[in-house]
């Protein structure tokens, strides 16, 4: 019913808009240096009380002016104010172009998005949703005062995953086709050249994409859009990296129509905030523009950011208590006196983008982009033949001992001997060097005998390499002075290469590529243990592929269109899109457990989806606005959710279908010289989603896949923000988010394992209705104050609060089969079913800066200190533990533990920048 009523109503509103003419004053505000449109510039008609603000294209409209001459005052943070006379005639003329000049002395104060505070460790965590919000942030009052303050708690705007916030780099959608997540490490460290961005909020229209329900962000990397400058900076921090050097040079648009920008950086830390972590990252960037006449412009952008990072892991509260710190990390240990981390992430996925802008007339623009990207991403981890060597393995914890005396003794050992809380690299080498074994007919060759020390422990590298190319084109046409239409087309070709290699044999001679549990689970089958039956008795050495090897083939295409119109007191838009999503798996190994269903191409899946969107904004006056927007559509499942055990077989999740998305939002906007505010209510429903996740079944010693079918959830809430400037020097900010994100269905659960076709759970009903959506605080608040001094310095203090961060929960415990043996309302019954949540959290943050002008040079100092009170009890992630090894787990209270991650205590970032 919603979509049936929406389109006729909006079409009736659009009809008179196409050719309506009124006495108004229209204009566009641009940057003098780059000629880029400026967003949210305050435009005041002196003596009348009328106020307007520029939109995302730099345009503003002042209506119902009496004919005559007026004085316009234009002001924007970081620019010199402009006062200029204008004539308001009876008939509208073409838009008047106004140019604002940057105030270089206050640059450090006015940088709209302080990317320098972005933490690389957070950028890849939990899907990166909270960082997606950071890059998505715009001049919108809610985002500018709230998103940065709440990023400490991994806040996700409206509870959405990052796939709902698509990110466009020079016209290219860079969200990962496999998962929908944007991996921001692909361009980390390039802050200086990624400042020029345009964002849409929620369901509002975008000129560059149809966007998703969270909005969209476009970053402009064209050299001609960059400020002409030479810029060098050094930063000192105690977060994921300690040091950062950056250098940027940009020519601006030169005679002959050329422009060039070069940028590079290096970030490093031998020890990150958490023990055992480290970071090494180098970034590079080249952008070249060629402008041909007034109508044609070409751009070539090349960038990359190779990085290597030793990572931390979540663990049990029991281990945090034994270690005496909330920053205990089980991933590392000493080797020959040096710290060594077993879990290291490496990534380098450079991208090349070719962009063409064509302006054949005043009313028509075309932007076309083609791109290619290729690279590798790898995560190392320990692989082993025997028992789990992790120091926080739950069988080794005091709580695993039934005898209280033994439990107390184990607790004393772990508490007082740090080496027992670390990986024992020395023992790995000793064991590997003393395990001689002979492999007959090695690698499938009769008579090929290999003798040597067979590895019991190795470091493996789980690779996720990829190749990608595509194009995106957007045509914009002004239908009249008050209406415009956009038409877009895009296509994406993607091949993901998933396999693992031997990274380090740890002193052994070889690793035997065989499933150690296959003969146990599938007895009597020839070659069942071989991961590739074409190479039985496969002996592998360093850098050789083993275990699994498959490709993800994805082909996506789409068309969209949108019409926007601006009446004197009403703005309306309507749009729609259609998409085709195709994908399939290609196995590169013939697995011994699935010899007929692992090698070659799987079934080719194809999904046709659509989306419709519309909305209106009613202008009460120049300062007060009401708006309402709606969306209805379908979305294809992601590749990650489509296969039962993608590492080893081609089997597809049965009855896989697109899911539905319905979303509405409405609210109030306040824009005045001293007050900016937004109050928004939103309601979004996701229906019939499929969710899949890979995990390790500790009780069986194998990897498995958990699949949920028929997942429904509802995200509802209120966003509010207010920014007040009682004087030119003072700014007071307040914001709040009150959300209610919960599941509304009882989906079916399938749990498979990688070494047998028999499911562990086959279509069990999961009673998760009314459980809360995890991984984000649903209640947040912020209060901030900022002072800007006359001698170009500023300081701000922000208090933030977060609550209702619910832990992710084990679906198998929410099935009838699991709880049937438990007494209702008993402690085990509640421990099995009740969803846990983190305690409420509070933080106090400081940010300040100072700038100096020395002849024609500028020096900027910025200081950011988060968590001034050193609150080390902020839980930012929690989940039910899957490490069940107790005989009677359902009744045994020791089984019901959570694995947690704590946010940083006091942490800082200090940067010094020189600019010419």
Each language-model region and where it sits:
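Surface-exposed extracellular loop regions of Gram-negative outer-membrane beta-barrel proteins
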Residues: 314-319, 528-539, 582-593, 604, ...
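Outer-membrane beta-barrel signature, preferentially recognizing the C-terminal barrel domain
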Residues: 328-351, 355, 552, 602-611, ...
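Short strand-turn segments of transmembrane beta-barrel domains in outer membranes
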Residues: 203-206, 215-252, 264-276
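Gram-negative outer-membrane beta-barrel transporters
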Residues: 683-685, 706-812, 911-915
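Short acidic/polar hinge/loop motifs at secondary-structure boundaries
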Residues: 134, 143, 172-203, 220-222, ...
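Signature of Gram-negative outer-membrane beta-barrel scaffolds
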Residues: 458, 484-621, 646, 748, ...
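Acidic/polar loop-and-plug regions of large Gram-negative outer-membrane beta-barrel proteins
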Residues: 289, 297-355, 378-460, 524-542, ...
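C-terminal beta-signal and adjacent terminal beta-strands/loops
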Residues: 732, 801-820, 850-916
């Amino acid at each position: 019913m919603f979509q049936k009523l929406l389109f006729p109503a909006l079409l009736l509103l659009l009809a008179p808009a196409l050719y309506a003419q009124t006495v108004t004053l229209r204009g566009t505000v641009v940057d003098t240096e780059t000629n880029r449109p400026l967003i949210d510039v305050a435009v005041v008609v002196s003596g009348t009380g009328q106020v307007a603000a520029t939109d995302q294209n730099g345009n503003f409209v002042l209506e119902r002016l009496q004919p005559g001459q007026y004085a316009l005052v234009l002001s924007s943070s970081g620019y010199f104010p402009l006062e200029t006379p204008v004539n308001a005639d009876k008939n509208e003329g073409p838009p008047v172009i106004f140019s604002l000049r940057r105030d270089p002395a206050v640059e450090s104060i006015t940088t709209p998005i302080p990317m320098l505070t972005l933490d690389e460790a957070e950028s890849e965590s939990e899907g990166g949703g909270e960082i997606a919000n950071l890059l998505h942030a715009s001049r919108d009052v809610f985002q500018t005062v709230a998103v940065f303050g709440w990023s400490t708690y991994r806040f996700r705007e409206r509870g959405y995953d990052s796939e709902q916030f698509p990110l466009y780099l020079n016209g290219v959608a860079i969200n990962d086709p496999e998962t929908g997540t944007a991996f921001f490490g692909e361009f980390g460290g390039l802050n200086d050249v990624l400042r020029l961005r345009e964002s849409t909020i929620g369901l509002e229209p975008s000129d560059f994409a149809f966007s998703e329900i969270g909005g969209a962000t476009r970053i402009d990397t064209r050299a001609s859009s960059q400020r002409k400058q030479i810029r060098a900076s050094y930063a000192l921090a105690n977060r994921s990296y300690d040091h950062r050097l950056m250098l940027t040079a940009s020519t601006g648009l030169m005679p002959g129509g050329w422009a060039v920008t070069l940028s590079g950086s290096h970030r490093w830390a031998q020890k990150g905030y958490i023990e055992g972590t480290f970071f090494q990252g180098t970034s590079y960037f080249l952008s070249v523009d060629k402008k041909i006449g007034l109508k044609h412009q070409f751009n070539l952008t090349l960038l990359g950011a190779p990085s290597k990072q030793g990572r931390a892991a979540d663990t049990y509260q029991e281990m945090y208590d034994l270690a005496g710190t909330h920053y205990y990390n089980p991933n590392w240990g000493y080797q020959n006196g040096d710290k060594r981390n077993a879990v290291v992430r490496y990534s380098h996925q450079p991208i090349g983008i070719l962009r063409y802008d064509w302006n054949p007339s005043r009313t028509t623009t075309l932007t076309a982009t083609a791109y290619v990207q290729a690279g590798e991403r790898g995560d190392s981890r320990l692989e082993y033949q025997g028992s789990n060597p992790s120091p926080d393995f739950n069988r080794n914890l005091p709580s695993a001992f039934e005898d209280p005396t033994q439990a107390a003794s184990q607790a004393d050992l772990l508490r007082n001997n740090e080496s027992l809380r670390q990986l024992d690299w020395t023992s790995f080498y000793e064991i590997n060097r003393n395990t001689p074994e002979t492999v007959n007919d090695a690698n499938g060759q009769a008579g090929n005998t290999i003798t040597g020390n067979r590895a019991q422990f190795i470091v493996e590298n789980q690779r996720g390499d990829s190749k990608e190319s595509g194009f995106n084109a957007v045509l914009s046409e002004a239908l009249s002075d008050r209406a415009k239409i956009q038409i877009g087309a895009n296509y994406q070709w993607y091949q993901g290469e998933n396999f693992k290699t031997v990274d380090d044999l740890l002193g052994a001679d070889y690793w035997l590529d065989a499933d150690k549990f296959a003969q146990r689970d599938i007895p009597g089958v020839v070659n069942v243990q071989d991961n590739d039956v074409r190479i039985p008795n496969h002996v592998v050495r360093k850098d050789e592929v083993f275990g699994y090897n498959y490709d993800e083939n994805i082909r996506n295409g789409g068309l969209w269109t949108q019409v926007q119109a601006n009446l004197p007191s009403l703005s309306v838009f309507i749009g729609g899109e259609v998409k085709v999503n195709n994908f399939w798996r290609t196995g590169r190994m013939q697995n011994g457990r699935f010899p007929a269903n692992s090698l070659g191409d799987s079934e080719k899946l194809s999904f046709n989806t659509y989306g419709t969107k519309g909305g209106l904004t009613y202008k009460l006056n120049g300062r007060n606005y009401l708006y309402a927007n709606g969306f209805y559509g379908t979305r294809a499942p992601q590749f990650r959710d489509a296969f039962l055990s993608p590492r080893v077989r081609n089997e597809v999740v049965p009855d896989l279908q697109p899911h539905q998305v319905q979303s509405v939002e409405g609210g109030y906007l306040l824009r005045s010289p001293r007050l900016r505010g937004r109050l928004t209510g939103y309601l979004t429903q996701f229906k019939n989603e499929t969710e899949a996740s890979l995990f390790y079944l500790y009780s069986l010693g194998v990897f498995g896949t958990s699949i949920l079918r028929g997942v429904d959830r509802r995200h509802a809430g209120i966003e509010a923000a207010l920014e007040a400037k009682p004087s030119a020097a003072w700014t007071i900010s307040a914001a709040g988010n009150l959300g209610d994100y919960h599941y509304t269905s009882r989906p079916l659960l399938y749990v498979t394992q990688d070494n047998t076709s028999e499911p562990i759970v086959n279509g069990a009903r999961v009673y998760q209705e009314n459980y809360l959506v995890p991984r984000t605080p649903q209640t947040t608040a912020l209060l901030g104050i900022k002072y800007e001094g006359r001698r170009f310095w500023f300081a701000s203090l922000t208090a933030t609060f977060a609550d209702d961060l619910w832990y992710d929960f084990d679906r198998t415990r929410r099935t009838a089969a699991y709880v049937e043996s438990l007494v209702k309302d008993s402690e085990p019954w509640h421990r099995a079913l009740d969803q846990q949540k983190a305690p409420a959290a509070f933080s106090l943050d400081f940010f300040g800066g100072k700038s100096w002008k020395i002849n024609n040079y500028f020096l900027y100092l910025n200081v950011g200190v988060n968590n001034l009170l050193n609150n080390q009890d902020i839980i930012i992630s929690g989940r039910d533990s899957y490490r069940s090894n107790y005989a009677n787990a359902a009744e045994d209270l020791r089984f019901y533990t959570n694995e947690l991650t704590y946010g940083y205590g006091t942490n800082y970032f200090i940067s010094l920048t020189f600019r010419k």
